């Protein structure tokens, strides 16, 4: 279940890079999703999940504007869908 960051991110980028933040948020989203499948009426966890999803989306938007090649590589490795463009 855990995402192997060493496959996605270089050694010197592991701490606070945008890519590592997106990976960590994706892992938290997966854990919270499993929790909410068992406890469907846990509304505070659901609110926290929505907050994490918004944070990941804003980081993905930032990454598309600054480094589109890295964005494409990251979403393919994490199995995420592309962002909708307006």
Curated annotation (Swiss-Prot):
It comes from the Eukaryota. Keywords: Chloroplast, Plastid, Ribonucleoprotein, Ribosomal protein. GO terms for biological process: translation. The keyword Nuclease does not apply. GO terms for molecular function: structural constituent of ribosome. Pfam families: Ribosomal_S15 (PF00312). It is found in: Plastid, Chloroplast. The keyword Aminoacyl-tRNA synthetase does not apply. GO terms for cellular component: chloroplast; ribonucleoprotein complex; ribosome. Part of the 30S ribosomal subunit. Belongs to the universal ribosomal protein uS15 family. This is Small ribosomal subunit protein uS15c. It comes from Psilotum nudum. The lineage of its organism: Eukaryota, Viridiplantae, Streptophyta, Embryophyta, Tracheophyta.
């Amino acid at each position: 279940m855990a995402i192997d960051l060493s496959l996605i991110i270089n050694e010197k980028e592991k701490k606070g890079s945008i890519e590592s933040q997106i990976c960590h948020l994706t892992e938290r989203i997966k854990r919270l999703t499993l929790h909410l499948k068992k406890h469907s009426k846990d509304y505070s966890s659901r609110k926290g999940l929505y907050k994490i999803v918004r944070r990941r989306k804003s980081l993905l938007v930032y990454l598309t504007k600054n480094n589109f090649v890295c964005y494409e590589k990251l979403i393919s490795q994490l199995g995420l869908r592309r962002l909708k463009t307006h």
